[in-house]
Regions:
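Long, compositionally biased charged/polar accessory segments in the mid-to-C-terminal portions
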Residues: 716-835
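Catalytic/regulatory signature loops of cyclic-dinucleotide turnover enzymes
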Residues: 358-368, 393-408, 675-679, 689, ...
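Divalent metal-dependent catalytic cores for phosphoryl transfer on phosphate-bearing substrates
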Residues: 1-165, 172, 179, 214-219, ...
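Conserved helix-loop-beta segment at the catalytic/binding core of cyclic-nucleotide signaling proteins
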Residues: 311-335, 361-365, 370, 472-504, ...
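Cys/His-rich short segments
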Residues: 405-502
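A short glycine-enriched loop-to-beta-strand structural element that forms part of the catalytic core
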Residues: 69-80, 268, 321-336, 363-382, ...
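Alpha-helical scaffold within the catalytic cores of cyclic-nucleotide enzymes
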Residues: 55, 237-248, 301-320, 348-358, ...
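Cyclic nucleotide signaling catalytic output domains
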Residues: 338, 349, 353, 372, ...
Length: 835
């Protein structure tokens, strides 16, 4: 009910007027709506449109699934603006509403809701959601905002619609609202028809509908329309669930004074932080690992799902709905919990279970640290206190990270015995550190527990249609995690999980709309390159040196349309056609990138406007770029790129070496558009060039080093590549210059105007130039480079007779002078890198 408390705001904007409401609903105006201070009109009429959702169910004779009381849910949703006249739920939702906003309701909010005024009605129907990303400020908050893509239209979420636009589209907004309202009402009724689903699945289904339809709807059009109805409603539902649990434990649900008391501690914040990700992700044996693509894909996916599993276990043990999970991205989990007498004991018991499982499965390399704050009063979430509250959460998290696996070590000591002493048969060939066991054999290879299940899961992820969480017996394809939690991936109809009664949570990836259940959808960065008809037509030449019928280690079938490419094939995609042959070196590039200054963005980026609702919105917006927008960008623009991981605020991609610098530049430009070209939100990246047989752990380390070099540049927002750090947009010495000059030189080489040997000569001239211009110890003998350069240039591109007569240099000389940086002012361009 708390989650639906403002659902009527969408319907109100979609239907346009209370005249569109059924008379039975319209007659409740005096019952549900408060009056303005002067008493001459009713305000907050969106509650009538929320009432319409329940009227729709009544009209079709529907009840809520899982025994949920339609009356209680309805009362919680519609009474929050007049709680003194309704049931006790109204007080809980009203208080949760204020806490989620980080402030009390302003008087002008009520005054602005004069729905009978045509100007006001047109205003709220034509005011778009402002991107929360455009509100981030790391510099002077008084600095004028730059123009950019700042406005969202209220349309269903997909990789294209989540990108903000520069235009407000005021004329189109009423039509958008009408279409979205119609779709939401239809899907709401359809969700409620499925009476066999559990309460948890129903809750997640409602959240799923909201993620699809509410993300682009402003929760308020009065003051700061930069928090969506989705994010505000999630925060309100989290506070309401915890208030209910807290007061229920003290038998105070019927005590409005206790509910409104903001000085008494009622909440806790919990953060789960997965540490050791980088080492655990790239823990590979020194020899060539069979199935490495699968294993890495599954590892990165599982590491994201471990925090999901922890959140599921915690809320089920505490009997809380899914709304209490505030943020979940990038290996971190943030939850709002009720303050109760059993909270610390319950969390400690969960910590022990998680530590035991993590220590034995990952041999101490990976830890999920749970930091729990001290009890927090409601006033700690108001805007003037939220900074202090978040600092408490950070301190609790850091304290937990300093004691990884502490619960396991207290009980068992530092030596792992069970797996290493019982049934071990040498080291695992995949990770090289954990014990191999014959019980975990797939495709004739025995591995450790973790690598075995990663290998199996990695085969299924590219075709994922459903991700289900089970509480109860699974089947042979289910993966047991800690506590009672099991994970089951479904890839097609033949793979359907039969025991739906055991499913306690689940979702479908974006793009799997044809799968009818579960209703919840999420973006997931699982794009991998596959063979298409053009690849197969060119296979005999493009993939020269590879067996044309080579069995793909991904698909376990001959190379064919739709089969997943191996790293060797991706490397070969770097080659380019030259007549009837393909030329170039088959190499890979590893791209690692992340958002700059993330701590500052969440700590101070929203200034005085920090609230739980805004922080939730900011976290989701960033995560959706990497999990929702990026896969679409790869599939449509860079289809030969392999996703190792992407989510939260960072990514790791592997692709053909020739395309990766261009991909990085386009990625930075697209991220800038997504963020409204906000200078406070920037991206840095590092690229490493490697062979297809290079161990990926070393490749990732090299990309990480390049990324760190980029972040060492003042202002960050740069690309590290081959020992250089380039600004993204500088036309004189940045990435645009590099791409332009390298493409120009490639064209000369391809047309055979310039021999490859001459390119190496240019590099030798640059070496001499650097020695001659060394600011510490210049070499005067190296100054001869200029004469040698001029001689070789004149021999390779001699002037024509007309140019000699006119004493004019060939135009191509100027191009080479620019390539060598002879016309540069200030710092030299990356000439060596371009060549």
């Amino acid at each position: 009910g708390a989650f639906l408390h403002d659902a009527g705001k969408l319907l109100q904007r979609g239907l346009g007027s209370s005249d569109a409401l059924p008379e039975q609903v319209r007659n409740l105006e005096g019952t549900l709506c408060p009056k303005a201070q002067a008493g001459e009109y009713y305000t907050h009429k969106h509650v009538l449109f929320t009432e319409l959702l329940f009227h729709d169910l009544e009209e079709q004779g529907l009840i809520l699934p899982a025994g949920l009381s339609r009356r209680n849910v309805r009362d919680a949703a519609v009474w929050h603006h007049k709680p003194e006249s309704g049931p006790v739920w109204g007080w809980i939702v009203a208080e949760a509403d204020r806490l989620a906003s980080g402030m009390d309701r302003k008087a002008k909010d009520a005054a602005a809701e004069r729905d009978d005024d045509q100007r006001t009605r047109d205003f709220y129907r034509r005011r778009p959601l402002r991107s929360i990303l455009s509100a981030v400020r790391l510099g002077d908050p008084a600095e004028p905002e730059k123009e950019g893509n700042r406005f969202h239209r209220p349309r269903p979420a997909d990789p294209e619609t989540i990108v903000a636009a520069a235009d407000k589209h005021e004329r189109e907004l009423p039509g958008d609202y009408a279409a979205t309202t119609e779709a939401f009402r239809r899907d709401w009724v359809a969700l409620c028809r499925e009476v066999r689903q559990t309460a948890s699945i129903f809750h997640e289904g409602v959240i799923g509908l909201a993620e699809r339809y509410w993300w682009g709807v402003p929760s308020s059009t009065k003051d700061e329309p930069d928090v969506s109805l989705l994010d505000h409603s999630l925060a309100v539902a989290a506070f309401a669930a915890c208030l209910h649990a807290h007061h229920a434990s003290r038998d105070e649900l019927c005590d409005p004074a206790a509910i409104k008391d903001r000085s008494r501690p009622k909440f806790r914040l919990l953060r789960g932080d997965l540490s050791g990700i980088q080492n655990a992700l790239f823990r590979l044996g020194s020899e060539q690992v069979k199935g490495v693509n699968r294993i890495l894909r599954a590892r990165s996916f599982l590491m994201g799902q471990l925090v999901e599993a922890a959140g599921l276990l915690i809320r089920r043990r505490l009997e809380l709905p899914p709304y209490v999970v505030l943020m979940r991205a990038g290996g971190q989990l943030t939850m709002l919990l009720p303050e109760r007498s059993d909270i610390e004991q319950t969390i400690e018991a969960i910590r022990e279970e998680i530590d035991e499982w993590m220590a034995t499965r990952w041999a101490g390399e990976l830890a999920l640290n749970l930091g729990l704050t001290e009890p927090l009063a409601p006033e700690a979430f108001l805007r003037d206190r939220i900074v202090e509250t978040l600092e408490r959460l950070r301190a609790a998290t850091e304290a937990a990270k300093e004691r990884p696996l502490a619960a396991f070590l207290r009980k068992n000591g530092p030596v792992l015995r069970q797996d290493y002493e019982q049934g071990a048969d040498g080291h695992c060939p995949a990770c090289g550190v954990r014990p191999r066991k014959s019980d975990f054999t797939e495709d004739g290879i025995a591995r450790c527990w973790a690598c075995h299940h990663e290998y199996r899961l990695g085969r299924r992820l590219p075709k994922l249609k459903q991700l289900l969480w089970l509480d109860g017996p699974g089947d042979e394809k289910a993966l047991d995690l800690f506590g009672e939690v099991r994970l089951r991936a479904v890839v097609d109809k033949d793979d359907e999980y039969k025991h739906r009664q055991n499913v306690v949570s689940g979702w479908r990836p974006w793009g799997a709309e044809h799968v009818p259940w579960p209703v919840a959808t999420r973006p997931i960065a699982n794009y991998v390159p596959t063979f298409d008809a053009r690849d197969l037509a060119d296979a005999s030449k493009k993939y020269r040196g590879l067996e044309e019928r080579e069995r793909s280690e991904e698909a376990e079938e001959p190379v064919e349309i739709g089969a997943i490419k191996t790293m060797a094939h991706i490397a070969a995609d770097a080659r380019e056609p030259d007549g009837d042959r393909w030329i170039g070196r088959p190499l890979l590039a590893v791209l690692k990138a992340d958002v700059d200054n993330l701590g500052q963005i969440f700590g101070a980026g929203l200034g005085a406007n920090r609230s739980i609702g805004r922080l939730v919105a900011l976290s989701r917006a960033l995560d959706w770029y990497f999990t929702g927008r990026l896969p679409h960008l790869l599939a449509t623009r860079w289809p030969d790129t392999y996703t190792v991981y992407a989510g939260g605020d960072d990514l790791l991609l592997i692709g053909p070496w020739r395309q990766m610098p261009k991909l990085a530049g386009e990625l930075r430009a697209d991220f800038g558009r997504y963020c409204g070209n906000n200078p406070s939100l920037t991206l840095s990246a590092g690229i490493a060039f490697v062979s297809a047989r290079e161990p990926l752990n070393r490749s990732a380390d090299a990309a990480e080093a390049a990324l760190e070099a980029a972040k060492g540049r003042p202002g960050k927002d740069a690309l590290g590549i081959l020992g250089e750090v380039l600004p993204w947009t500088d036309p004189a010495r940045g990435l645009p210059w590099l791409l332009e000059k390298s493409d120009w030189l490639c064209a000369r080489l391809r047309e055979d105007e310039t021999k490859t040997a001459f390119a190496y000569k240019l590099l030798s001239f640059l070496e001499l130039k650097a020695r001659a211009e060394d600011p510490v110890k210049p070499d005067p003998w190296a100054a001869i480079w200029r004469a040698r350069y001029g001689y070789f240039l004149a021999r390779t591109y001699p002037p024509s007779p007309a140019e000699r007569e006119a004493r004019r240099q060939p135009a191509i000389w100027s191009e080479f002078h620019a390539l060598m940086g002879l016309d540069a002012k200030g710092a030299p361009p990356p000439s060596k890198l371009a060549i």
